[in-house]
């Protein structure tokens, strides 16, 4: 196998007219497993409108993943509780909005997906860093943070109330 004819990437080739051994990707080519044609899961929209529902079932595992990813990617700016008081603010950067303001509490979940995917204002896009499934998990965790800010005992299921000190 060592002594067989082959093209070594980034070395010149006399075979092709452009003299490159590494072939350019053909326009419109989609890598295997990367089609992402589910508008809700990968675009955060339903019929072109920001989604109001999650594309998957939100359970304890999704919430735990969302908390983990939120703490990694979001808390440096937004803080661990979503108040907009992360460590970058302490270093002089512009304060991001609190996740608890009415505008964001009332925003559809698709809005958060769009902002994480494409950026907004001073926030850069995170589509390349955070997988779509993880963006949805983060949104579920943000919704939990928002609910916790204004929760009452009536919001707690009766079976769980006895665990509250």
Predicted regions, residues:
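Periplasmic c-type cytochrome electron-transfer domains
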Residues: 2-61, 130-141
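Phosphate-coordinating loops and pocket residues in cytosolic domains that bind phosphorylated ligands
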Residues: 3, 79, 101
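A general structural signal marking secondary-structure boundaries and capping sites
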Residues: 5, 81, 120, 146-149
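A generic secondary-structure boundary signal that marks alpha-helix termini
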Residues: 10, 39, 75, 121, ...
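Short, glycine/charged-enriched secondary-structure capping and boundary segments
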Residues: 16, 90-92
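Sequence/structural segment immediately N-terminal to covalent heme-attachment motifs in c-type
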Residues: 59-83, 89, 96, 111, ...
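Flexible coil segments in periplasmic/lumen-exposed cytochrome c-class electron-transfer proteins
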Residues: 71, 88, 96, 103-109, ...
């Amino acid at each position: 196998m060592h002594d067989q004819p082959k093209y070594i990437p980034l070395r010149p080739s006399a075979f092709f007219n452009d003299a490159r051994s590494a072939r350019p990707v053909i326009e419109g080519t989609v890598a295997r497993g990367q089609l992402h044609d589910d508008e809700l899961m990968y675009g955060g929209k339903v019929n072109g409108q920001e989604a109001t529902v999650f594309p998957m079932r939100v359970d304890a595992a999704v919430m735990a993943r969302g908390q983990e990813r939120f703490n990694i990617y979001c808390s440096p700016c937004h803080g661990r509780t979503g108040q907009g008081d992360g460590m970058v603010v302490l270093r002089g950067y512009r304060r991001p909005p609190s996740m608890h303001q009415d505008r964001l509490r009332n925003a559809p979940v698709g809005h958060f997906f769009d902002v994480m995917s494409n950026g907004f204002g001073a926030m850069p896009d995170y589509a390349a860093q955070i997988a779509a499934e993880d963006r949805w998990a983060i949104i579920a965790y943000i919704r939990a943070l928002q609910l916790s800010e204004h929760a009452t005992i009536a919001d707690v299921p009766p079976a769980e109330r006895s665990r509250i000190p």
